[in-house]
């Protein structure tokens, strides 16, 4: 879906109709997923600058989903004449603010469930993109200053991705503790990327595998869903596709 279409959809979303808000979210989410898939699959043939531009576009689409969800919740509150109730942690800017919205248990549960599924899917897509970027850097230029500089850029990108996820998490997750958990989870990425690079340079594959599996075990112990971690680790061992 083109950016202009996204903007047109946002502009036509009624502020006082939560049903239209639900429809808009249903339109945005599939396009967002497609954008993530394209970004991940094309990572190996994309320059760092182009990838950064793609991330900015992705961030805008995440914002569109958040705006649509905001409209839906505000419409629900307006149509049902609700002015107080369940306090949800919500953010449309870098600084969060509180909004009191009363939701039925069914709607509240469904919203959190869908949000958690999307967050898990997106997190692992980005994890795969980060690890693949590190691999392609090594294959392209395993020696020299240029390789070191590019690996440094990869680690910086990991922090950028962490910031992107943390900001976007507040759109989808109505639980501050979950957002904090995502933040802590993302802090592991720079370590993983750096360790993967040093492990490949020094052929320490056993230590690399052990470190990644230990991290995954700690994440599982913390309750974070890492169903795709084995697939991600497999990609790390295999290197770039043919």
Model feature map: region roles:
Residues 4-12, 92, 108, 143, ...:
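Intrinsically disordered, low-complexity regulatory regions with latent secondary structure
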Residues 65, 72, 129, 168, ...:
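Residue position in alpha-helical solenoids
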């Amino acid at each position: 879906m083109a950016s202009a279409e996204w903007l047109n959809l946002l502009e036509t979303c009624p502020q006082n109709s939560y049903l239209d808000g639900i429809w808009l979210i249903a339109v945005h989410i599939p396009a967002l997923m497609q954008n993530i898939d394209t970004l991940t699959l094309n990572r190996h043939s994309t320059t760092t600058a182009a990838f950064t531009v793609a991330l900015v576009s992705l961030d805008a689409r995440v914002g569109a989903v958040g705006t649509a969800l905001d409209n839906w919740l505000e419409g629900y509150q307006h149509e049902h004449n609700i002015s107080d109730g369940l306090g949800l942690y919500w953010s449309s800017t870098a600084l969060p603010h509180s909004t009191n919205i009363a939701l039925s248990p069914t709607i509240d549960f469904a919203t959190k469930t869908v949000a958690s599924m999307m967050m898990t899917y997106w997190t692992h897509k980005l994890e795969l993109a980060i690890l693949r970027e590190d691999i392609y850097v090594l294959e392209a230029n395993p020696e020299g200053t240029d390789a070191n500089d590019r690996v440094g850029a990869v680690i910086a990108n990991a922090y950028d991705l962490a910031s992107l996820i943390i900001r976007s998490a507040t759109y989808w997750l109505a639980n501050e503790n979950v957002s904090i958990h995502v933040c802590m989870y993302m802090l592991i990425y720079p370590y993983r990327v750096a360790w993967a690079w040093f492990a490949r340079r020094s052929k320490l594959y056993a230590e690399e595998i052990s470190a990644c599996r230990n991290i995954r075990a700690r994440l599982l112990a913390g309750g974070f869903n890492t169903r795709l971690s084995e697939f991600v680790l497999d990609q790390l061992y295999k290197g770039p596709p043919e």
